Amino acid sequence: MLSDTICAIASGQINQAISIIRISGPNAFKIMEKIFLGKVGKSMEITFGWIHDDNQKIDQVLVLWFAGNKNFVGEDTVEINAHGGVLNTNLILELILKTKLARLANPGEFSLRAFLNGKIDLVKAQAINDLIHAEVKVQHQAALNQFLGKSSNFIKNLIEKIEEIIGIIEVNIDYPEYDDVEILTSDVLLPRINQLLADFDQLIKIANNSRLIYQGIKTCLVGAPNSGKSSLLNILINENKAIISEIPGTTRDVVEGNFVLDGLLFKLFDTAGIRKTTEKIEQIGIEKSYESIKKADLILHIIDASEKNRQNLDLKAKTRPDQIYLKIYNKSDLLENQEEFKDEILISAKYQKIENLLEKIKSIFAFLGKNKEFVANSFQISQIELGKLAILDAKTSLESGFGPEIAIVDLRIAWKELKTIFGRVDDENLLDSIFSKFCLGK
């Protein structure tokens, strides 16, 4: 894989002031000798000249030269800084491919090579991708902490604890005659296994909060027709996206939008009003409303506070313990007396008076902003959970009467699952899956 040379546009296919074309591999400098009218630079040098095709000038460029491992990729690399027109940039890329000394890179292949060349571990590689795709400040900070290795320390501590137990078991098996060896029976080992499980549970609990940071907080707006769901969505996303009408059943499909609060990304779903109806299309919309409730992290149940005979929708009964459910009383502007709602969240979507709702949401999710030291993406969470399962198997073996020499098999599996987070990956398909999510040219 690393014996060939790859190239790609690293700056995106848009008109811009400057574009970057990256070439990496053993033929990188040889390609430039063919297409560059200018001085072939030394490593870490920038040179100025023309890109040409058989002496036909194409663009005047700056070229950055990186020899060997003195760059991100860890192999001979050239970066061409060209004028950023889409056509101009693609003409240069086509010229590079025309030499037949390079092929077009796959998405994430430069980062994959950096990983395989030992320049970055798998955590840093994924952190780079997360930095690129960060939409809000909290996501950016989480990805940066991953890149700086702050999150890695939590996992490395678990790995060290497992290694210590494996080491003691191996000494017990191989050198039982040594006086200084701690005798590790099942009774002695079980408390250590239980402590490991507690450590895993704590890590998984914290890590699961990372999903809310990376994927956004899925927020479902539900309620009876004309309760003000669409009005609230439009206010939150600052856009007239949902249709507002006095006619019940106007919203037939789920309307989506995003908004940022306190640095956190919220993904909103405005659903069809829930009521009893014989209208087939409206029934389909209501079914979709219930589906959205199942997927949500935060459920905002919007209720028309001005209605004397309010429809009693027991939506809380349809929620799970891990979901957050809030009752929101709308249309405060129509109330003569608000005393009835003094302990409730009361808003007026019509007049954009929703400050108390925003403050309530901020207080609920404040813990996410404080959890800046440890975050994990979906791949890392999966590996931690697999590690925990292996530790559970070790515990089961010990409780079933088997000795440490059997439990060590599962401990080694747990160790491998955690080490995979940093790059001890034997499965090439897994690597391809991880890096294929990266941008072309990265």
From Swiss-Prot:
Stored Gene3D superfamilies: P-loop containing nucleotide triphosphate hydrolases, Probable tRNA modification gtpase trme, domain 1, tRNA modification GTPase MnmE domain 2
Annotated cofactor note: Binds 1 potassium ion per subunit.
CDD domains, alphabetized: trmE, TrmE_N
Keywords attached to this entry: Cytoplasm, GTP-binding, Hydrolase, Magnesium, Metal-binding, Nucleotide-binding, Potassium, tRNA processing
Residues that bind Mg(2+): S230, T251
Keyword Glycoprotein: no
GO CC annotation, single: cytosol
Residues annotated to bind (6S)-5-formyl-5,6,7,8-tetrahydrofolate: R22, E79, K119, K442
Descriptive protein name: tRNA modification GTPase MnmE
Organism: Mesomycoplasma hyopneumoniae (strain 232) (Mycoplasma hyopneumoniae)
GN (gene name): mnmE
